[in-house]
Amino acid sequence: MFFFITFVEFFDFIVNDRYANFTKRGIDFFFSGDKRVDLKDLMNYLYESGIKTLMLEGGSTLNFSMIKEGLIDEIRICVAPFVVGGKDSHTLFDGEGFDTMDEGVRLELFDSFKLGDDLILQYKVLNK
């Protein structure tokens, strides 16, 4: 089991002895970055720990950070038969974005299938 914290949060663990209690239970800690986790370091750490596949569920800001760093190999999109959202809704990738088609990330559809009423589209990321 893994637990990720930023360096600033670490001091709470030292003061409260929670860090030692977690490590006694076999929970590994990953320390990286100053205010944010260095995602490339994290992916290397997970790979070296034997984790070869990761499902990303952190939200649109994390999605953008990961794709910007070239850390996403595959994207699965679920098209569901209903409409939600609005002008302030998050998109699949929130962040500074890519201004031109050349800067953007190219995808290749390699599979699609129905799952109940939903349609699942599987894309390979081409230019990581």
Across the structure, where does each feature detected by a protein language model lie?
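Enzymes that bind and transform nitrogen-containing heteroaromatic metabolites
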Residues: M1-K128
